[in-house]
Amino acid sequence: MSRRLFTSESVTEGHPDKIADQISDAILDSMLRDDPHSRVAVETLITTGLVHVAGEVTTSTYVDIPTIIREKILEIGYDSSAKGFDGASCGVSVSIGGQSPDIAQGVDNAYEAREEEIFDDLDRQGAGDQGLMFGYANNETPELMPLPITLAHALSQRLAEVRRDGTIPYLRPDGKTQVTVEYDGNRPVRLDTVVVSSQHAPDIDLRELLTPDIKEHVVDPVVARYNLEADNYRLLVNPTGRFEIGGPMGDAGLTGRKIIVDTYGGYARHGGGAFSGKDPSKVDRSAAYATRWVAKNIVAAGLADRVEVQVAYAIGKAHPVGVFLETFGTEKVAPEQLEKAVLEVFDLRPAAIIRDLDLLRPIYSQTSVYGHFGRELPDFTWERTDRVDALKAAVGA
């Protein structure tokens, strides 16, 4: 088989773009907690000494947005000007308006209800925007995710853990990881390169202290969990030589700039829509979760080794305008039979997705860092494999 390398990256909770995502989702959760039908589209910009939140919201509740912002930044660990940012004293600016009534009328009263015929109440809610969304799954890991992004997220989570628990006390919140895996055909066989960039306190010796600590406490424990040749992998720690200035002081952060980190690490296609700060009436988010659910159940059912699912919507219309499956030649049944089974087993109208995945809950803060997919947490309903039997029955397996 042909050998090739594939690389994915992740970032920690202190990366400026991820701070922005976490703030946007914390605001969303606060609104959904009191008003599950809140319509929320909130964007965050964070830079040296300042956080600006803007967007469109329609809700019956009130939330103290400046307090939410400050609490989230302090929780992440930016609590001192010595670290380059202090959530207690930074400037906060909020510019929130209402959702456009032109958009709202299409969501509240779908095209089917106005121009066609409705067959149940799920036909009444239209998609919150046009667009295309992708979901993916493969059999490389127990979570049915590509291995490079799974490893990269595990390293980022571990990097945050050793900072928080004091194992490596001189680390600071900003950090990135990158993993290059060698494949033999479609099978991951060897860890080639690991890159870890972590913000740290001043005057830390890279060669004698930081690199050995990262290898011992972060990389080796994570790599040991996976059945992968890793005897001679290359480790690059802070390749610039120093990473003292980080977080919003080092780079401005924006909601929605880590969409590949949030999904499959580049292993699958992406429709372009970000997730954080959006309530589930926005199909950018809810349909991406639904297509992951579809893809994972297909692989879990043994109907394909790899599958990518695309769904597309027109704004204000309940039914998708298109559904497409790509199995890369790994399907165990005829592709047209598999597509028919998916349409029979899964209802991809926005209201049905929200119902089936129970998305009107304040669950989104936990999605906003370390990946929206592949983490089998109780609230991540799109990670369930609860339609396996129905899919098998639909294809006669």
Swiss-Prot record:
Chief place of localization: cytoplasm
Region (Flexible loop): 99-109
Protein family: Belongs to the AdoMet synthase family.
Gene Ontology MF: a single term: ATP binding
Positions bound to L-methionine: 56, 99, 251, 282
Protein residues bound to Mg(2+): 17
EC number: 2.5.1.6
Keywords, comma-separated and alphabetical: ATP-binding, Cytoplasm, Magnesium, Metal-binding, Nucleotide-binding, One-carbon metabolism, Potassium, Transferase
Species in which this protein is naturally found: Thermobifida fusca (strain YX)
Chain ranges passing through the membrane: none
Protein name in the entry: S-adenosylmethionine synthase
Pathway the protein acts in: Amino-acid biosynthesis; S-adenosyl-L-methionine biosynthesis; S-adenosyl-L-methionine from L-methionine: step 1/1
Domain of life: Bacteria
